[in-house]
């Protein structure tokens, strides 16, 4: 009986120690919306934010990525290509594409390695005859560390207002390589 009690206490202590050593991730949800009016038709702006986006997308897993590319079709990838050998990252997968109207992709983007689902939607709305209201909606659910929602929103502010908007207004998206 004493042996069984000792084994039971030992097992209980080990399970308590193991439980204390394990840090359970925090699960949460967050979302936000951004918008900016850009010069160009919805189709022109759609084309500028798909295909090769290396001219304005600047957050990467690689120190010197070769290319960022969004394939604007269902099942297409949002790729970061590291080098000529094809090493890289699939940041997300396109789940809805309608040129000049909507692009939606599902994937963790910079949160790769976490148990998180991030759905990002681009919407394109004509403003007058030569401008587009570009709307970005981000919805996320899953493993979310403290401060991550604010960081992700800040990064999107950077992409939209510090990178994409000046890129479009400079006309660089119209220069074909």
Give names to the regions the model predicted.
Residues 45-49, 78, 94, 105, ...:
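Hydrophobic pocket/interface hotspot
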Residues 67, 165-177:
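Short, highly charged C-terminal tails/helix-capping segments
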Residues 107-158, 175:
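Beta-strand/loop substructures that line and gate deep hydrophobic ligand-binding cavities in soluble
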């Amino acid at each position: 009986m004493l042996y069984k009690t000792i084994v039971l206490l030992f097992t209980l202590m080990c399970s308590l120690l193991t439980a204390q050593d394990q840090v359970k991730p925090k699960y949460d949800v967050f979302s936000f919306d951004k918008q900016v009016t850009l010069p160009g038709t919805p189709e022109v702006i759609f084309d500028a934010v798909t295909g090769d986006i290396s001219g304005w997308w600047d957050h990467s897993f690689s120190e010197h990525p070769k290319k960022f590319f969004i394939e604007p079709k269902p099942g297409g990838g949002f790729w970061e290509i590291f080098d000529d050998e094809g090493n890289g990252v699939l940041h997300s997968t396109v789940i809805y594409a309608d040129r000049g109207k909507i692009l939606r992709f599902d994937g963790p983007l910079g949160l790769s390695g976490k148990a998180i689902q991030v759905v990002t939607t681009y919407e394109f709305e004509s403003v007058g005859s030569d401008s587009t209201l570009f709307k970005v909606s981000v919805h996320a659910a899953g493993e979310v560390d403290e401060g991550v929602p604010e960081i992700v929103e800040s990064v999107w502010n950077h992409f939209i207002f510090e990178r994409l908007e000046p890129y479009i207004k400079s006309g660089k998206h119209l220069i074909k390589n």
